[in-house]
Amino acid sequence: MLWAIVLLGYLLFVVEWFVIDRIAGKPAGILDSNTKVLPNYDGWVNSFFANSAGSIAGSATNWSITLLRAVGSVLCGIVVLKFGYRYAVMIMMGLMCLCFPFLIIGDPLGGNNQLTLLRPLSKEVMGKLSSLSSQLHEGQLLGPVMAEGKTMLADGQTIDLVQGLDKNLIGTSSSIAGYALFIIFRSTIAIGGTTLVTYSQPLIASLSTQRRKSVLSNANLWGFNSGIVVAFVPFLFQSVQQAGTKYWVFILTALILIGFGILCVFAWFEKQMDPFMPQKQTKEQMQLGNQPSAGDILKRKATWKMIGMYGICLVVLVNPLTGGWWNILQAVSPASSFNVKDGVKTLKPLEGAGGYFAGLPTLAILWVLGYGMGYMVFSPFNKTVYDRKRWLSFMFFMNALMVIVIVLFAATLGVGTAVGFAFVAIATFIGGSFAWSMQSTILILPHEFKEYKRSEVSVLFGYIWGFGYVIYTAFDITNSMFLEAPKLANPGMKGVSILPGAIAGVALFAGLLLAAIAIVVTLPSSYLKNGDELVSEMTKKWKLNQWQFLVASKEKNRYADLLK
């Protein structure tokens, strides 16, 4: 029951994390006397930005959150030792609820929020927008206005707009400060939510059998994957996208209240934890060394090998869910596969929904649903007595291969054609099956290494997730710099191709996956364990043609000896 509640809290975090981006809306733009169509001011981005801040600044949202997820994950192990398991979970769930000020910061509040760009239209400024006169009325919320050589807010206040890296005028110093505060409070969702999946591991470690540990470790992944599906499926439809951006404050308020409800349910049902669960440390216990030392765990070589391997695993899991990956696929696609209007690419087979709305969510959903196939075909390996190194080497290689296959389909057929998008979608689904099932194998390893006791698992997973997200953040920063470099080299020019940066990003992506194999071969051996007692080492070597574990059963099956 407690495991399900903790996993539900993690699922809610994933939904919040991705839904916020889906209902962001568009920058406010700058109105002038020639503007004939009034912009749509739904969503929260227009509160802070007049124009796009570019790939690097735009990705800063993701960087800051993944870095703070790293901080939260590292701290979670320390928190559970300091306060005990029950209060650690409640603290982190409470932290998710403390994000609510970002709702106030991002809402124009009827034009009274000095941290946003939207203001009530004054009669004087309305007279300067003659081409929009039939669409305007006094007091209407509008974004910045350019008139008579001056930039002003809709209430007539003269302002200076800050230039972005690509020379666009992006916002005022106040709105950019507001955006920084928005990100800081939003990040509490990430800090608290990330730790919940870490806190599910002590519950798994307390189970009596390796098989049950394997089942729940695999099931843990459905928390993230289900959250992705819930966050992306509604936005396949443009009507939902429009409604979501219009009512973004109400949607996010509801999600925060649901999170508070989950916190209350956990506090109500929580009972005395199993003695094996991490408990609060007293000074005497620290001195006697009865409880694990977070510092000692971090010093172990196996910990850093797990961090490096899992960091690269996070790259392959998260990158295909980002706009940066979608931009790469569009950049390598033939120009003939798109309709281009006013410099905006639209997928031909999905014009009704628009390239961004339908393309990225569709591939993201297929990517996470790929785990369904992986769960049946690849994850059963976790129940075997095979040594893990060859298997993980094979999985990292296959992930690198699928990245290359997806890019080749996009480059030759184009994601803007029905056939090309279909092939990319199929390859994405297959690639997801390899990636997510590989993660399930990685997450079972700490339960099989002799280096770690059950009481140390929560601390170890905190380090794995924490420093792993540092690795992912470094990749995300580098990738966004690759994509932005062609534009920075040609400031002020429109329609600059990001193809060179896209190629560099793909090379980095696939190269990291192949480099992970060098870490895998140095991993410690896995053991069958009874609690913290070592039963036997898993020495049986897996070969490429050995897939009998798919049909192995403990009940009178000739392959039963393959199972734990």
Curated annotation (Swiss-Prot):
Subcellular location: Cell membrane
One GO CC term, this protein: plasma membrane
Main location: membrane
Membrane topology recorded in Swiss-Prot or TrEMBL: Multi-pass membrane protein
Residue intervals passing through the bilayer: 1-21, 65-85, 89-109, 176-196, 220-240, 249-269, 306-326, 358-378, 404-424, 425-445, 457-477, 501-521
Domain of life: Bacteria
Keyword Ribonucleoprotein belongs to the record: no
SUPFAM superfamilies documented for this protein: MFS general substrate transporter (SSF103473)
UniProtKB keywords: Cell membrane, Membrane, Transmembrane, Transmembrane helix, Transport
Family: Belongs to the major facilitator superfamily.
Protein name according to UniProt: Major facilitator superfamily transporter MPN_076
Source organism of the structure: Mycoplasma pneumoniae (strain ATCC 29342 / M129 / Subtype 1) (Mycoplasmoides pneumoniae)
